[in-house]
UniProtKB/Swiss-Prot annotation:
Signal peptide: 1-28
Superkingdom of source: Viruses
Keyword Signal listed: yes
Organism listed in the record: African swine fever virus (isolate Warthog/Namibia/Wart80/1980)
Keyword Heme: no
Protein name: Protein MGF 110-5L
Family listed: Belongs to the asfivirus MGF 110 family.
Induction and repression of expression: Expressed in the early phase of the viral replicative cycle.
Length: 121
């Protein structure tokens, strides 16, 4: 019985360590080790992009887009198991941190940039 209990406890510990834990006060600049989580579920947040000279490069991948209204300042926070994105003007997204859902209200504004052809999609 003790072996089963310890096995279950070990599995739970493995799951918890791969999730965001603890409280995160509202911030526009989450730590580097949390960027993958926050930028996966709402990539239009300004902290997900490095923008210079009219082009923005995604910090997690090789995607380059034209700098426009797609990239928005975002405030993210976490309390218990609730993760929240706040885009201002009453636009926010709250999700269970351990069961995240992709959400991007500005998806239609995304304009990818191609090096060979500066035309956008």
């Amino acid at each position: 019985m003790l072996v089963i209990f310890l096995g279950i406890l070990g599995l739970l510990a493995n799951q918890v360590s791969s999730q965001l834990v603890g409280q995160l006060h509202p911030t526009e600049n989450p730590s580097e080790n949390e960027l993958e989580y926050w930028c996966t579920y709402m990539e239009c947040c300004q902290f997900c992009w490095d923008c210079q000279n009219g082009l923005c490069v995604n910090k997690l991948g090789n995607t380059t887009i034209l700098e426009n209204e797609y990239v928005h300042p975002c405030i993210v926070s976490r309390w218990l198991n609730k993760c929240m994105y706040d885009l201002g003007q009453g636009i926010d997204h709250v999700m269970v941190c351990s069961q995240p859902k992709y959400w991007n209200p500005y998806k239609i504004l995304k304009k990818e940039w191609k090096e060979n052809n500066s035309q956008n999609k």
